[in-house]
């Protein structure tokens, strides 16, 4: 087994056995710039979709000045939507940088990760720059406020999105959902397993 395969096998094992909380990369953001929201109600919404449903299409502005749509990946790549509740908060500021160690797993399964928040583009742009940049597109569901989050049934009563993951296949069908306790990062193991199932 060459070094690359050994490294991938080790990362896979870690992902399947450990939650992302144990694997997250440092945010790079000084603690005095992070807003501590305290303990929140774990869930505050009702899903409007289920596994097997077609995913709602979307067109969202990204922090690089472009636009991302679900349609642009149809027939080409699976898509993972990673929703976080709010920029500049502790858990969110650790979650997305944590994906840096699994970029090759997304690529190996023909899967595009898209980060989504209901924050506006300037806020997201400043936050991502402070984190040192990310390898995946970051999109704003700010206007109409939370439209995509609402269509999925993950818009909380305070206007934030639930911390959640949606895996959508190349045909636009939802194959995996994790609406997670807003106070902690989700375990990526089950998501990686679902991504690999689509690769078979």
Region annotations inferred by a language model:
Residues 135-136, 154-166:
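Structural micro-motif
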């Amino acid at each position: 087994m060459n070094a690359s395969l050994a490294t991938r096998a080790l990362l896979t094992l870690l992902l399947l056995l450990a939650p992302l909380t144990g694997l997250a990369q440092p945010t790079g953001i000084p603690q005095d710039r992070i807003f501590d929201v305290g303990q929140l109600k774990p869930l505050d919404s009702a899903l409007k979709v289920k596994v097997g449903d077609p995913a709602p299409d979307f067109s969202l502005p990204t922090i690089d000045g472009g636009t991302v749509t679900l349609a642009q990946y149809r027939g080409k790549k699976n898509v993972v939507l990673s929703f976080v509740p709010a920029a500049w908060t502790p858990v969110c500021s650790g979650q997305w940088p944590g994906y840096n160690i699994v970029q090759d797993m997304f690529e190996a399964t023909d899967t595009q990760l898209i980060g989504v928040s209901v924050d506006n583009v300037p806020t997201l742009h400043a936050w991502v720059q402070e984190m040192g940049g990310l390898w995946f597109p970051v999109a704003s569901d700010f206007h109409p406020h939370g439209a995509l989050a609402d269509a999925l049934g993950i818009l909380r009563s305070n206007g934030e999105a639930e911390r959640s993951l949606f895996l959508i296949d190349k045909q636009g069908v939802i194959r995996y959902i994790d609406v997670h306790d807003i106070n902690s990062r989700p375990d990526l193991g089950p998501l990686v397993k679902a991504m690999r199932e689509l690769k078979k």
